[in-house]
Amino acid sequence: MDHLPIFCQLRDRDCLIVGGGDVAERKARLLLDAGARLTVNALAFIPQFTAWADAGMLTLVEGPFDESLLDTCWLAIAATDDDALNQRVSEAAESRRIFCNVVDAPKAASFIMPSIIDRSPLMVAVSSGGTSPVLARLLREKLESLLPLHLGQVAKYAGQLRGRVKQQFATMGERRRFWEKLFVNDRLAQSLANNDQKAITETTEQLINEPLDHRGEVVLVGAGPGDAGLLTLKGLQQIQQADVVVYDRLVSDDIMNLIRRDADRVFVGKRAGYHCVPQEEINQILLREAQKGKRVVRLKGGDPFIFGRGGEELETLCNAGIPFSVVPGITAASGCSAYSGIPLTHRDYAQSVRLITGHLKTGGELDWENLAAEKQTLVFYMGLNQAATIQQKLIEYGMPGEMPVAIVENGTAVTQRVIDGTLTQLGELAQQMNSPSLIIIGRVVGLRDKLNWFSNH
């Protein structure tokens, strides 16, 4: 993060703009809207500045820039078309430890001005760090269309209710659930927009007096195979509303960065063949946090119901009467194959696909005869350590040794690595790869050279 986003309280504080043209005017509007006591210095001014000065909204100082203008300032903006003058203003401000923005020269500035969506008291700022103002503007326009104009009224009304809500609801969890109900209540929003005081009061009383469910809840969320862009919209919404996030090793750092900043994070460290936290203990963590009235997200790589033991976790919650829901994720088979240029099914090569766990332990034996059949694709999860056994068994039951195979490591991530070969090489190939990896076996692997798109990007 190159810049710390902050919102400055400038009401009745001295600010200086050096420049009297159109760019300076745009900056002046922002500072006036923020209530600043504004001085503008320039050799000449466009008419708007004169009109503001005549209305007593700001002070004009006509003439060359003098550093003494900064003596009482909280904040300054250099907005002239003279680069040398802008640099001089910046250096003079820096020597006085005054924040200074230099228009179109972010490297010379001690702060930058973001694009702003104003739904006061709700403010949203979008910045590209000065590298691409056009991109920031485009993002602002998209956000403008998503945020209702009356959102500011709802936020302001919420501020008026804070004292009462604090008295009414004892815990932070109860208050948060109340606020979530209020902010998504369309009737209240419309009543505020129409200034319908009767409807505002009725809706508010109904929301406050409705009994809250004191039980917490658990949401099982599939994080997808790695690329944060593959996280579903609903999954994103859930992790941003969570009080507690219980996650494992397969959840990428990019996805973890999307979690609510004040949420508790509990790492349970699961990976193929190794469990830092036993499954039963994970079940109890979910149960314990939910019983405290918290909203818990169990965040799993891929899809929670495909070799994720999500069903076992939900059985524990169900037996304890804890509400739960599931947000599916893109499973590793889909993500890794797509990012490797390997279609799992193909009219000419595979009419079915099988997802198989590579955990060949506790004496369990797979149906190798059916797995060795033609016209299908096999995807082995967590099969890296058993690759030699998989190779031996499939050949033993009749699969041709020249059957194409691929191993995908860190699928969909920027660190993705793929090697391919034939079934007779599978055990040897596996020794070159690290977990997490996925094994794909079938004729469709032969299409990889033609369809591989990700490595070219």
UniProtKB/Swiss-Prot annotation:
Transmembrane segments: none
Active site: 248, 270
Region (Uroporphyrinogen-III C-methyltransferase) location: 216-457
Domain of life where this protein originates: Bacteria
Residue pairs linked by disulfide bridges in the UniProt entry: none
Annotated binding of S-adenosyl-L-methionine, by residue: 225, 301-303, 306, 331-332, 382, 411
Record region (Precorrin-2 dehydrogenase /sirohydrochlorin ferrochelatase): 1-204
EC numbers, comma separated: 2.1.1.107, 1.3.1.76, 4.99.1.4
Keyword terms, alphabetized: Cobalamin biosynthesis, Lyase, Methyltransferase, Multifunctional enzyme, NAD, Oxidoreductase, Phosphoprotein, Porphyrin biosynthesis, S-adenosyl-L-methionine, Transferase
Classification via InterPro entries: 4pyrrol_Mease, 4pyrrol_Methylase_sf, 4pyrrole_Mease_sub1, 4pyrrole_Mease_sub2, CobA/CysG_C, NAD(P)-bd_dom_sf, Siro_Cobalamin_biosynth, Sirohaem_synt_dimer_dom_sf
Pathway assignment: Cofactor biosynthesis; adenosylcobalamin biosynthesis; precorrin-2 from uroporphyrinogen III: step 1/1; Cofactor biosynthesis; adenosylcobalamin biosynthesis; sirohydrochlorin from precorrin-2: step 1/1; Porphyrin-containing compound metabolism; siroheme biosynthesis; precorrin-2 from uroporphyrinogen III: step 1/1; Porphyrin-containing compound metabolism; siroheme biosynthesis; siroheme from sirohydrochlorin: step 1/1
Residue sites binding NAD(+) per the record: 22-23, 43-44
Gene Ontology terms describing biological process: cobalamin biosynthetic process; methylation; siroheme biosynthetic process
MF terms (GO), sorted A to Z: NAD binding; precorrin-2 dehydrogenase activity; sirohydrochlorin ferrochelatase activity; uroporphyrin-III C-methyltransferase activity
UniProt modified residues of type Phosphoserine: 128
Reaction(s) catalysed by this chain's protein: uroporphyrinogen III + 2 S-adenosyl-L-methionine = precorrin-2 + 2 S-adenosyl-L-homocysteine + H(+); precorrin-2 + NAD(+) = sirohydrochlorin + NADH + 2 H(+); siroheme + 2 H(+) = sirohydrochlorin + Fe(2+)
Homology family: In the N-terminal section; belongs to the precorrin-2 dehydrogenase / sirohydrochlorin ferrochelatase family.
Function summary: Then it catalyzes the NAD-dependent ring dehydrogenation of precorrin-2 to yield sirohydrochlorin. Finally, it catalyzes the ferrochelation of sirohydrochlorin to yield siroheme.
Record NCBIfam families: cobA_cysG_Cterm, cysG_Nterm, PRK06136.1, PRK10637.1
Entry protein name: Siroheme synthase
